Each structure stands twice: as C-alpha cells, then as structure tokens.
C-alpha cells in the first residue's frame, strides 16, 4: 500500500471532516438562500462553518468570504482591489496563483506591478521593501506566509507593519501553505486580506476562503446571484 507523505502539496480528507459532510452530501437538499425550513437549516450549517474558519484564523465570521479555493481567493484579493489601477507589490517567490494574477494586471491602464526582491535565504528583503514603499503610493502588497516548496517562513508581521506605515496601503497574505501547519492569526499578521484553502488542512477540495478585515470594497470576479 502506498504511503503518502507529500502533505505540503495536498492533504487527505480527515475522517471526522467526511463524517461532518456526509449528511449534506446525502440529503435532504436545500438552497441556503431559500426561506423554508430546510433552506434555513442549510444556511445555519454554512454560517457555523464560517464561524469555525474565523475562529481558526483569529477573525470574525462576517469577514470570511467563501471561494472555490486558494487561486480564486488570491485572484479576488488582488483583482478585487486593483480593478481601477494603482501600484501592486508582490514577493518575487510567490505562488503562481499570485504571480500570474499580478502579471496579468500589467495590461490594465494606470497599473504598476513590481516584484519585491528576496534574500539568498528566500526572505522578503525588508530594506528593499521599505525603499519601494517610499518611492510612490502603494495600493496593495501581497506576500505568501510560507512557501511549501522551499520551507521559507516569512516574517509576515514585520512586513505588515512596514506596509501599514503607508497611508491607504493594503496588505494581502497568501496563507494557503501555512494554515493548518503554523499558527495563523490575521490580526497578529496585520493582514487586511488573507487567503486559505481547505485541501491543505485535511478538508475537501474545491473550498477556500478570503478573509477581509479591512473596510475595502472588492470588485467581484463573477456577477450573479447574491448567494
């Protein structure tokens, strides 16, 4: 029998998670936006899950936005903030979900996209970050908390403090690789936006979340029903 050890790439579904999900996979079924009894029960289950995610990450339930995974959450954070242009800084060793999203914005009018250099050890070069922050107004800084391939763990709190010295600058943390392995507290990190993904911490695939702690309007990636 194969032994799976690559838990930095993905994790198996925990038995207790499967047990909690089965009642909703097997029915009865109801749209959580419906006002009848079954609809309200579905809504209650979603809100209970939202509260658990918030508690895990030191946030409030109202700050949790459900997504289809880490990639959508990262795109919503970055494109949602940058849709009208501005200046975006991102770490030079980010996950492709951030790096390619950032690079796609180079075609957007009035948008400047710059990478933040890292040291030989893979850490964000704080002196270079301070210099970049001082050059011109910054709209958003995006940095991953931990790198699943190199094992580098960023000093996210120090980066957050540097970002918040700049008026109106927002700080996005990609915590997909950290949540479930390291303590993640959105307040201690100073993150205005924070991304997590369920399949990295023994949950189902196809589920992620974006935490929004700052009072910022995010331009939606999709348009449709409120649910």
Which residues fall in each region the model found?
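Pyridoxal 5′-phosphate
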Residues: 1-227
């Amino acid at each position: 029998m194969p032994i799976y050890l690559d838990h930095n790439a993905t994790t198996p579904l925990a038995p207790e998670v499967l047990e909690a999900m089965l009642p909703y996979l097997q029915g009865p079924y109801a749209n959580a936006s419906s006002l009848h009894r079954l609809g309200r029960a579905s809504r209650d289950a979603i809100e209970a899950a939202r509260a658990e995610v918030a508690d895990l990450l030191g946030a409030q339930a109202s700050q949790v936005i459900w997504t289809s995974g880490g990639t959508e959450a990262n795109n919503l954070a970055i494109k949602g903030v940058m849709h009208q242009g501005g200046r975006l800084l991102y770490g030079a060793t980010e996950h492709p979900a951030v790096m390619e999203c950032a690079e796609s914005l180079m075609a957007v009018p009035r948008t400047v996209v710059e990478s933040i250099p890292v040291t030989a050890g893979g850490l964000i070069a704080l002196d270079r970050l301070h210099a970049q922050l001082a050059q011109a107004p910054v709209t958003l800084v995006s940095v991953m908390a931990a790198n699943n391939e190199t094992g580098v763990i960023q000093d996210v709190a120090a980066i957050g403090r540097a970002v918040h010295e700049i008026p109106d600058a927002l700080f996005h943390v990609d915590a997909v690789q950290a949540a479930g392995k390291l303590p993640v507290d959105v307040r201690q990190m100073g993150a205005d936006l924070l991304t997590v993904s369920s399949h990295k911490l023994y949950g189902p695939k196809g589920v992620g979340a974006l935490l929004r702690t700052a009072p910022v309007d995010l331009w939606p990636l999709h348009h449709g029903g409120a649910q």
